[in-house]
Design a protein with these regions (language model features):
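Polybasic, lysine-rich low-complexity intrinsically disordered segments
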Residues: 9-10
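Short intrinsically disordered terminal tails
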Residues: 14-15
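Flexible "arm" and connector segments at domain edges
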Residues: 18-81, 87-150
Length: 150
C-alpha cells in the first residue's frame, strides 16, 4: 500500500477521486510508515539511527505533554500528544523487531492477555470469577519466574 501525503488526492476503487480528509490512516499505515522511516538505506536519516537510549528523553517529554493536555482539558492537543506517545511506543517496538526480539503485535497480544487475565469476572469461566486481584498478580509473578528459569 502506498502512503499518501497530506493534501494529495486519493483514488478509490473505480477511479473515484476522494479528498484526503475523507480517508483516515490506519494502524497498519503507521506500521508501514515506521518501517519506511527506519529503513537503513532509504529511510529518514534521523529516525533510522535512533536507539532505545536516544529516544528515552522523547518518551518522557511526550508523556509529560499528555499529562499537560489532560490537566488543561485540551482534548484536541491530547489527541495529538497521544499520537506522539504512540509513535514512541512504535519506534521502540520497531527497534526490537529489527533485533528479532518482538513486534508491536506481540506487545498488543501481551496487553490483551493481561487485561483478560486480570478481569476474570468479565472474561473468565465460572471458576475464575472468584479470583482476587492479589491472587491474579501472584499467578502472574509465578509465571514470569517460571519463564525466566527455563
Amino acid at each position: 500500500t502506498d502512503i499518501r501525503m497530506p493534501g494529495q488526492k486519493v483514488f478509490a476503487p473505480g477511479g473515484i477521486s476522494m479528498e484526503p480528509e475523507d480517508i483516515m490512516y490506519t494502524f497498519d499505515d503507521l506500521k508501514q510508515i515506521l518501517e519506511k522511516l527506519r529503513d537503513k538505506e532509504n529511510g529518514c536519516p534521523w529516525d533510522s539511527v535512533q536507539t532505545h537510549e536516544s529516544m528515552k528523553k522523547y518518551l518522557v517529554e511526550e508523556c509529560g505533554e499528555v499529562l499537560e493536555a489532560i490537566d488543561n482539558q485540551d482534548t484536541e492537543n491530547l489527541c495529538e500528544e497521544l499520537g506522539d506517545v504512540l509513535y514512541q511506543i512504535m519506534i521502540h517496538c520497531e527497534i526490537e523487531k529489527e533485533q528479532g526480539n518482538f513486534t508491536i503485535d506481540d506487545v498488543v497480544n501481551g496487553i490483551c492477555e493481561k487485561m483478560v487475565r486480570r478481569h476474570p469476572r468479565l472474561f473468565g469461566g465460572e471458576m475464575e470469577k472468584d479470583l482476587t486481584w492479589e491472587e491474579i498478580k501472584r499467578r502472574e509473578k509465578e509465571a514470569r519466574a517460571a519463564r525466566k528459569n527455563r
